[in-house]
UniProtKB/Swiss-Prot annotation:
Record GO cellular component, one term: Sin3-type complex
Subcellular localization: Nucleus
Protein name from the UniProt record: Histone deacetylase complex subunit SAP130-B
Main location: nucleus
Species this chain originates from: Xenopus laevis (African clawed frog)
Ranges of biased composition (kind: Low complexity): 576-592, 707-728
PANTHER family with a match to the protein in the record: HISTONE DEACETYLASE COMPLEX SUBUNIT SAP130
Gene this chain is encoded by: sap130-b
Annotated spans, Disordered: 1-62, 111-131, 572-592, 614-769, 806-852
Origin organism lineage: Eukaryota, Metazoa, Chordata, Craniata, Vertebrata
Biological role stated in the UniProt entry: Acts as a transcriptional repressor.
A GO biological-process term: negative regulation of transcription by RNA polymerase II
One Pfam short name: SAP130_C
Length: 1041
């Protein structure tokens, strides 16, 4: 998605931001071009050189990321913030600024980090965004994220920024996701204004700035509420800058958070994750803003959270304009303070684990840390954990994260080493179909999980044992399921828990991971604020993972916060923030939610922040899950077979989303669901704006819905959410808020259940989790039907929770369900040489299990409708209505099915044909042939010789007759003078000669032929000899036997 694709609204925003950023300012103004350049630069130079060296082992595989540099992040954790810087787009202008933003530490790291991944995902626009980021510490943060995740995430985020742009963003997100998945796209992920639609960019910027500010002033600001506010303000301006960083570094959660608003949800998410992770990984890394750099562990996180909170608020308010001040002012801060760990945890889980995105990178921690403070907030919100604290801003981040995860996954993997890799693969395994997935797929890319980067574990890095249980769940969920418990990753145990959350970031495919993260989150993080989310009664508790509306709605929650300051507070308090979310949604555009839902999931959040589409954020998270990931796929680009997946939207959608339909236009929902179901990863995009509304609904409601409804809605909503991302955001901003709410709520319950469920899985999850589990399972089931991995996608509506749910399902309930659909992508292909005779079969060959499941369900529901057409009736006026069945146009083609039988009778390739090698007969073989003695006698030869004799006799007869004729003519001397006689004579003579010649030759041939029989005796002798021996030899072995 080049920056061109989206208007550079954010860019305009930048100037204010710039001020914050300082160096950034110029860049922002400059616009995409500069950003692009920077992107390129960072990507190429930094990414290639810096990143690469760093993480040779696994990260290289990370290459999957479109942004190789980021991959390079291989340097992984250590991810130097430098890469972050690059991310920022600082490259050109920001560079200096970035240092400013980050503390010295961060600065160091950033360079290397930046290249890591940040750059790749973002399109050129991202670059522009980078400039915005420029000044930001964010950038540095990002660099921490650089692992990979960040970039993708950021991208998404940015896109989400605008409701209308949503589609674009979605596209961008998808693209970016694709990039991430494929690793092909070079463009850095910088989430830049360019990337985002104008509106989105602006919003992102605002959101971002909050984060950014934090990063920059970080130490001072974060500590106090006042500082917080201040930071918020600053952030607003630098948001873009921040975001780019985000983009750059999924790892730096802090940065990401900021970014979310501005440019890429991805970055935003990243930011938060980074932050969260950072504390665990590298308190030191924490931004200067985090005074507690010392505490690698949670402490840092907490502070960061505070900062993040503030920041978040800011982003929120930017989106909301009026609200923002309030938001960021105290509420946000409080949130963070209260749940700061939560936010961090969310992000950190994966990150902390090892990757926390880059930040997590222990070595890189410095820069990461920087991001941490800011990011934490952001990311968390995305998931549920953060939702409360930094929801607004963070949420966007979360959104981003999903994508990011994809990118990150490789990085994270790296960071985590093998285990990490596994983690990521889980998400990735599904990813295979979708790019995102890819990310996960590349086991190298451990960072994926990091993407979530929920910091939750951050504060409880040591405290929680999330490591082990946390990761495992994730894996399960993913299906890939590398069950590596995060425990392996234990190093960042706290983060590990978060990691799960991190997973959320994953794209559709990674969604599962995300879920897992969440679950983990819940488990690992529960004790802390995360607990609140999943475990803590506090703010997050309500939703469980989802509780933090932030998580599910987390994303929206944040936006909500942003949009409504009080909502933000609400979030903190409620954790679930149901009300807050609702109000928010009503007030702000639910679209945000939607946007994020799909691959854009991450984006949505950022957008939310900016646009106050908080709900969307949540959804988004889930959405990415869609890819099932494998589905996955998460982004449309990532989706393995987007076209195929999109084929049956109507049918599939319908079946799944019962609840959704009522709230939103059935058709919007239906398609959306379809899409989501069909291809969690790719489908979403196709969904139109309407879907967005649906999505929105899902998300918003995510807070706490009816369990029953949740199930259905969940499934429906989640699917939609994935679809919505694109369409959702733009179209239903206003409508969704009020209308969707109910639906949303329903869905939310589902999410919550899901969320809860995961905790049960984790076992850490305290209470609520269990109940949700039931729902979750139900939800999962529908999902499963849709597609095993789908389980996750359905959750999307709940976004964070949902993912968890899905994970839980996958892990627990889904285990059973998976078999049928098991890994959709892994479905055994039909043997190539067997060509099905039925069209249906052929279709199945290309379709995934998920698809099939979807088809089944939807079909069952639809057929019923079709079977019972309206019966004829007579109305009050006596008018008789007879149902007329619309007749399809008459076509010969309609009944034509391409039978593939022809393939059976034609060679498809050279290897299908092989020349038969004739076997040379041995004497024994010849001797043992039937009638060999008869043949030796030469009867055929004699027969032929007799016939030749007849020919000779015939020729002789002709010769004699010609002689007589000639003799009759010659005597007359007139022949010489008579031309005719002369000619006849000549002819006779010629014929006589021919007869002689033929007779001689035939005789000769006959003699030669008969000579063959001269050896008859000898041949018979040999044959009798060898023939006998052969028979004996055949008999002997039998005797021996």
């Amino acid at each position: 998605m080049s920056s061109q694709q989206f208007p550079r609204q954010a860019v305009s925003m930048p100037p204010p931001q710039v001020s914050n950023s300082g160096a950034s300012v110029g860049q922002n103004v400059q616009g995409d071009e500069v950003a692009r350049e920077i992107d390129v630069q960072s990507r190429d130079p930094l990414g290639a050189s810096t990143v690469l060296p760093s993480r040779d082992d696994k990260q290289e595989p990370v290459v999957v990321r479109p942004y190789p540099q980021v991959q390079m992040l291989t340097s992984h954790h250590p991810l130097q913030p430098a890469p972050s810087l690059t991310m920022t787009a600082q490259p050109a202008h920001l560079t200096s600024a970035v240092p400013l933003s980050f503390s010295e530490n961060i600065l160091k790291t950033p360079k290397s980090t930046m290249p890591s991944r940040p750059i790749a995902p973002a399109p050129p626009s991202a670059l522009s965004a980078v400039p915005k980021v420029s000044g930001q510490g964010t950038v540095t943060m990002e660099s921490g994220l650089p692992q990979t995740s960040a970039i993708p995430v950021a991208t998404i985020s940015g896109q989400q920024g605008h409701p209308n742009s949503l589609h674009h963003i979605m596209a961008a997100t998808n693209v970016q996701m694709s990039i991430i998945r494929s690793g092909a796209p070079g463009p850095p992920l910088h989430i830049g204004a360019s990337h985002l639609p104008r509106g989105a960019a602006a919003a992102a910027v605002m959101s971002s700035s909050k984060v950014t500010t934090m990063l920059r002033p970080a130490s001072a600001q974060i500590p106090s509420a006042a500082a917080s506010q201040s930071a918020t303000q600053h952030i607003i301006h630098p948001p873009i800058q921040s975001r780019p960083p985000v983009t750059t570094t999924s790892v730096s959660p802090a940065v990401v958070a900021t970014v979310s608003a501005t440019r890429a949800q991805s970055p935003v998410i990243t930011t938060t994750p980074a932050h969260a992770a950072e504390p665990v990984l590298r308190p030191t890394l924490a931004f200067q803003q985090h005074p507690p750099p010392a505490a690698i562990s949670i402490q840092r996180s907490a502070q960061a959270r505070d900062a993040a909170t503030t920041r978040i608020t800011l982003p929120t308010h930017p989106a909301l304009g009026g609200q923002k001040p309030q938001l960021h002012a105290m509420t946000q801060k409080t949130l963070f303070g209260t749940g700061n760990p939560v936010a961090a945890a969310t992000v950190a889980p994966i990150l902390a684990t090892n990757t926390l995105p880059s930040v997590t990178t222990s070595g890189s921690a410095p820069h990461t840390q920087v991001s941490t403070s800011t990011i934490v907030t952001m990311t968390m919100p995305t998931h549920s954990s953060h939702a409360t604290a930094g929801t607004a801003s963070n949420i966007p981040v979360a959104k981003v994260v999903p994508q990011q995860i994809t990118h990150t996954s490789p990085r994270i993997q790296s960071e985590y080493g093998t285990e990490r890799g596994n983690l990521i693969p889980i998400p990735g395994h599904r990813a295979s179909p979708n790019p995102m997935t890819m990310e996960a797929r590349s086991e190298n890319r451990q960072p994926v999980p990091v993407q979530l980067q929920y910091f939750l574990p951050t504060y409880p890095p040591s405290a929680y044992p999330l490591t082990a249980h946390t990761y495992t769940p994730i894996t399960s969920s993913v299906s890939t399921i590398r069950q590596y418990p995060v425990s392996a990753q234990a190093p960042n145990s706290a983060i590990t828990a978060q990691s799960v959350a991190s997973t959320v970031h994953l794209n559709p495919m990674q969604l599962i991971n995300m879920d897992t993260s969440h679950t983990r989150h819940i488990q690992g993080i529960q004790p802390a604020p995360v607990s609140a989310q999943g475990i803590q009664p506090s703010p997050f508790s309500a939703q469980g993972i989802q509780a933090t509306p932030i998580s599910t709605q987390g994303i929206h929650p944040t936006p909500i916060n942003t949009q409504a300051i009080h909502p933000a507070t609400s979030i903190t308090n409620q954790g679930v923030q149901t009300s807050s979310v609702s109000s928010q949604q009503a007030s702000s555009e639910p679209k945000s939610s939607v946007v994020l839902a799909e691959g854009a999931t991450i984006i949505a959040n950022p957008i939310n922040s900016s646009f106050s589409a908080t709900p969307a954020g949540t959804t988004v998270m889930q959405s990415h899950s869609q890819s099932p990931g494998i589905g996955s796929s998460p982004a449309q680009g990532s989706s393995p077979r987007p076209s195929i997946l999109r084929k049956k939207p109507a049918t599939e959608g319908l079946s799944v989303r019962k609840s959704l339909i009522p709230p939103h236009p059935g058709d919007a929902v239906s398609p959306r669901h379809d899409s989501a179901l069909r291809s969690t990863s790719a489908s979403p995009r196709p969904a139109g704006a309407k879907p967005k509304a649906d999505l929105h609904v899902s998300v918003a409601p995510g807070v706490t819905g009816d369990p029953g409804a949740a199930d259905q809605p969940s499934a429906a909503a989640s699917l939609p959410s994935s679809h919505h991302p694109t369409a959702a955001v733009p179209s239903p901003p206003s409508q969704p808020v009020s209308g969707p709410m109910p639906s949303s709520i329903h869905i939310t319950p589902a999410t919550i259940p899901a969320l809860s469920a995961p905790p049960p899985l984790l076992s850490n999850a305290p209470s609520g989790a269990v109940m949700p589990e039931d729902k979750m399972k139900e939800e999962a089931e529908p999902m499963d039907i849709l597609r095993p991995v789908s389980a996750v996608p359905p959750l999307p509506p709940n976004s964070i929770s949902s993912p968890l749910t899905v994970l839980a399902n996958n892990i627990s309930g889904p285990a059973g369900e998976l078999p049928p659909g098991a890994s959709p992508r892994k479905k055994p292909r039909k043997q190539q040489h067997v060509i099905s005779t039925e069209e249906g079969d052929m279709m199945e060959t290309n379709s995934t299990d998920e698809e099939r499941c979807h088809a089944v369900k939807p079909f069952t529901s639809r057929p019923e409708k079709r079977k019972s057409p309206p019966k004829e009736y007579i109305d009050e006026e006596g008018v008789r209505y007879v149902p007329v069945r619309p007749r399809p146009p008459i076509t010969l083609l309609r009944h034509y099915r391409n039978p593939w039988k022809a393939a059976y009778h034609h060679f498809q390739r050279y290897t299908d044909v092989r020349v038969k090698e004739e076997k040379k007969l041995t004497l024994q073989d010849v001797a043992n042939q039937k009638g060999i003695t008869c043949r030796v006698q030469g009867w055929k030869t004699h027969l032929c010789a007799a016939q030749l004799l007849q020919l000779i006799k015939l020729e002789q007869d002709v010769f004699e007759r010609l002689t007589v004729l000639q003799e009759g003519l010659v005597p007359k001397k007139k022949t010489a003078t008579d031309d005719d006689l002369h000619r006849i004579n000549e002819l006779i003579q010629g014929n006589m000669q021919r007869c002689k010649l033929v007779m001689d030759q035939i005789t000769e041939s006959r003699d030669c032929m008969l000579k063959v029989l001269d050896h008859k005796d000898r041949v018979l002798k040999l044959l009798n000899k060898s023939g006998a021996s052969r028979r004996l030899s055949k008999v002997k072995p039998k005797d021996k036997m």
